[in-house]
Structure formats: C-alpha cells, structure tokens
C-alpha cells in the first residue's frame, strides 16, 4: 500500500494555519485634484477612524455614509487634515469628496472617490 510501511500508515503532522491578521480600524486618506488614495482596501466593520489629508490646492471635503445610512462630512481647506470617526457595516464603504454633488463638475465625478471593504 502506498505510504505505508509494514501495513501502518504514517501521518504527517501539519500545524494549524495561524489566524489571519486583524483588519485595521483606522485608515489614512489623501485627497488631491482629482483623486483619492488610502492606506488600506479592507478594514474592520464597526468604528472606523479616518484621518484625511487635503494634499490639493483647492478646498475639498471628505464624505462617508455610515452603517445607518447617515452622511458624515468634514470640510478641508488646502493643506488641512482632519479625523472623522464613523460606524461602518460589513460591505463596501465609499469615501468621496461631496463638493458640487449632483452636477457634472462634482469632485466625485472627477475621480475623488475611494472604496474600502469592511469585514
């Protein structure tokens, strides 16, 4: 029989895989004309702390919709930074600049949006 010696099976001991690293509960986001980038693509569901920096020359804001569907925004002058804390549910979370929302000139339409996934 394959894998046996003298009729006995030898089993390899395979240690259990280590647990996956904990997902972050905070994220840093840079805003600039006309884009956004963040430090993480996945975050922990629950309380999320967002540290946002306006690296652009224009004024912007950061907008995020929390787990209850409430829109939170923080205004950012050029060169400013701020911290926004919101509760997020598991699933996609969109962070965006809400200036000129609903118009063709909205900052979101120009590329100022960043998606993370809460797990």
What are these regions (language model features)?
Residues 9-28, 35, 57, 76-119:
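Extracellular/periplasmic metallocenter environments
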Residues 34, 46-50:
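Structural beta-strand segments of beta-rich domains
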Residues 35-42:
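Short beta-strand segments of immunoglobulin-like
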